[in-house]
Amino acid sequence: MNPSRDEEASLTETARYGVPIQPASAPSTDDVSLTETARYGVPIQPASPPRAPPPARPESPRKREPVRVGETDSLLREPVVFNPDEFTRHAAFLGGPGSGKTTLALNVIEQLALQGVPSILVDRKGDLAGYASDAFWTATVGDPRRAMRQTALRDRLDVALFTPGHPGGRPLAIPIVPDGLDALPDFDRQQATRHAAEALAGMLDYRQSPKDKSCRTLLAQAIDQYVQLTRESVSLERLVKFIGDKDPRLVNAVGRLDVKLFDKLADDLDRLRLDAKMLLDSGAEKLDMDLLLGRGAHATAGRTRLSIVSTKFLGDNNNVLFWVSQLLIEVTRWLSRNPSPTLQAAILFDEADLYLPATRQPSTKQPMENLIKRARSGGLGLMLATQSPGDFDYKCRDNIRAWFIGRVKEKVSLDKMKPMLSEARVDPAKIPGQATGEFHVARDGRVDRVKAEPSALATEQLSDDELLRLAARTRDSGHLSS
């Protein structure tokens, strides 16, 4: 969304770097949008005390600043900016290794944090956890814009690093079914219990055989009936007993389904209970959106929570998919209780093709598609980044407004992207030759060639030992405020 000529008159030179600022004097509401020092992504303190408003005049809400993603790759070098609320319609960052897609996504996350919008980063490789490292905050940065952003973030961020699946860091215990489903409308409850059943079925390695399909159906019915019968949390132990005892209400709900399957499913769940103790560690902090977003009792005055969830310690993909599916279900439930007309939080999924692939149906796919559709009304922005854009499910593109398309060289990936590129009026021949940080930004049928702004964090993969050490430090302090 490039500003019009009239709008440019109200944007001073430094607005080009998309940072929330404080006025040096008392400007009008229109003048507040962007000023010189906003260019560097830093909240600027006034040079002299502003004139106090009349006592009877109510304080107007703080106006959010546009998020600067870069500038057009043209002679004019016009800034390319987004209204923060546009991200409630989601964004996809596509590009191969070295394209700069992750630093572009983090640039957006950082600017939102400076405006008080918390974020969750779901990190598969360990290269998003640098915000928890002392090296990031003490490093000398040559680029003055990045240096000023780094300083601003130091004063504003509240970093929490989680390592689900490993007690040596900061584990997060997930419920096999989120609490509070009994309070949801029937459709929402049944959808959530079905998603939870699919996640458990993935952990049990159930496939598409008739017997496995019947077990999936029985599992979904068991969870749905249990949450209606009691307000107790659904645990594997309780679920095993409920199914193994062939509760009359459950038997009635499944109709003519073979009752022999009850024993098989109960045995399978009991084995999972023994195998997945670390994953479901009841002694760990509980997965809770207020914890991840730094709200309520977890809030730190004057700071914005940035939670990094490292999935490196969860084991194989089935475990990762199960854990992330539970996160997606919890996020959806939280949104239904905390709707917002404006952006209130963001979640970045790195290598999102694992969760939303084009051809497979992992346990994360339906919850992710459901969240993409529903997050806008809840004020949540989803950011999906992937190194394998050809494997990404483009069927969701109608619900994703902004597409940041970086360098992609693989012919197979380009061929799979052609329908989307054609719809966005992007010439596929130009994609492989883009340099690092160069993107085609497509939104609402409009395309800009953009040179992206870098994030303050230069991503670097941390070792497992370093991740655990940093996570334990945020656990012991409750957070890391640099």
Q: Over which residues does each language-model region extend?
A:
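Basic- and hydrophobic-enriched, low-structure N-terminal and domain-boundary segments
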Residues: M1-G96, T103-Q111, Q115-I120, K125-Q150, ...
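Conserved H-loop
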Residues: R124, D350, L380, Q387-S388, ...
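The conserved Walker
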Residues: P97, P389
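A short helix-turn-beta junction within AAA+ P-loop NTPase domains corresponding to the substrate/partner-engaging
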Residues: L161, K395-R407
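P-loop NTPase motor domains
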Residues: L104, E110-P118, G126-Y131, F136-K373, ...
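Conserved P-loop NTPase motor module
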Residues: P3-E8, A24, S28-V32, A47-R68, ...
